[in-house]
Amino acid sequence: KGDVRTNPGISVKLSALLARYEYGHKERVMNELMPRALKLARKAAAANMGFNIDAEEQDRLDLSLDVIEAILSDPELKDWQGFGVVVQAFGKRASQTLDWLYALSEKLDRRIMVRLVKGAYWDAEIKRAQVMGLSDFPVFTRKACSDVAYLAGARKLLGMTDRIYPQFATHNAHSVSAVLELA
């Protein structure tokens, strides 16, 4: 089976597992989607491969964290080190999300992978906030702020290596060199 760190891995987008993946349907998500995602995680664990919960839009973050906690709490996955979560640095709650994941890993006595990315769906996040008439945006509106948030998240993750296996994804050469320098 090899080592989970060198074996292939898979990323799963929770919204692909249930059409109504939104907080208003939390009960349905936990009753229908969570068991599907748990089954996939168990299969990944049996193959000793990585299994990442991919990032979603910011308004789905709390729901994703509920699903993540339910899966990580499964006793069958206790000894598996291949569970991962993708966190988008451009989200204004990214730092708190990293803290929450660390606290969860401590509570459950688990080690998890966290992949930090800059973020996706920026245009959609901005448009949705405008359409809803929100007083603020859930994501940083300037690229420079997202870049700084990414580096702050990287620094934070590198300080959590007793519980978190940090992973970094970026297309920006400056960000790559900065993360290497931080490490």
Each language-model region and where it sits:
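Positively charged, amphipathic and often flexible ligand-engagement surfaces
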Residues: K1-A183
